[in-house]
């Protein structure tokens, strides 16, 4: 059975109720069942969580699925806080050991000290921007994809831990 860890990064704040990302996360919970050949663990960043239990979920998972809105061209602050605190707790506890560099030559191998090799992740983002804002010449994002633009750092963060992006 594939072990799936789903994280709902949709945050309740102001006029954003986080309902759409909650709905997407609920669809995952309906699909990733034992009957379909999956084991599932789930976190909603709006609920209380234990840092070491969250670290253990990352270590346990074969695939991590992140669902998040994009606010002001980045992650909602509670989701960013979740990642910062969980990944920090995961230092030498299964998420990453070091930044990968060695004393003999500290100029190379930065970002290779992750402990989650062999695992994959998938990122879904929700926007108020139309697809054409990314694809049409002269539009706001200058023909730069979400992955190569706004979410580039997010993808590098996952690479730092050793995870690879799931194709699709």
Residue ranges with predicted function:
Residues 5-7, 41-43, 65, 120-124, ...:
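Hydrophobic/aromatic beta-strand patches that form the interior of the parallel beta-sheet core
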């Amino acid at each position: 059975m594939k072990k799936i860890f789903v994280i709902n990064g949709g945050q309740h704040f102001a006029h954003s109720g986080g309902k759409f990302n909650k709905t997407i996360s609920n669809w995952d919970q309906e699909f990733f069942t034992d009957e379909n050949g999956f084991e599932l663990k789930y976190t909603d960043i709006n609920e209380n969580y234990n840092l070491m239990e969250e670290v253990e979920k990352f270590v346990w998972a074969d695939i991590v699925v992140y669902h998040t809105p994009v606010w002001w061209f980045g992650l909602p602050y509670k989701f960013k806080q979740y990642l910062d605190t969980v990944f920090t707790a995961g230092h030498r506890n299964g998420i990453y050991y070091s930044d990968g560099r060695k004393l003999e030559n500290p100029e190379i191998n930065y970002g290779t000290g992750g402990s989650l090799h062999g695992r994959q992740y998938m990122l879904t983002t929700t926007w108020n921007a139309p697809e054409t804002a990314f694809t049409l010449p002269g539009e706001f994002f200058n023909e730069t994809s979400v992955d190569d633009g706004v979410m580039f750092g997010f993808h590098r963060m996952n690479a730092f831990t050793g995870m690879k992006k799931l194709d699709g």
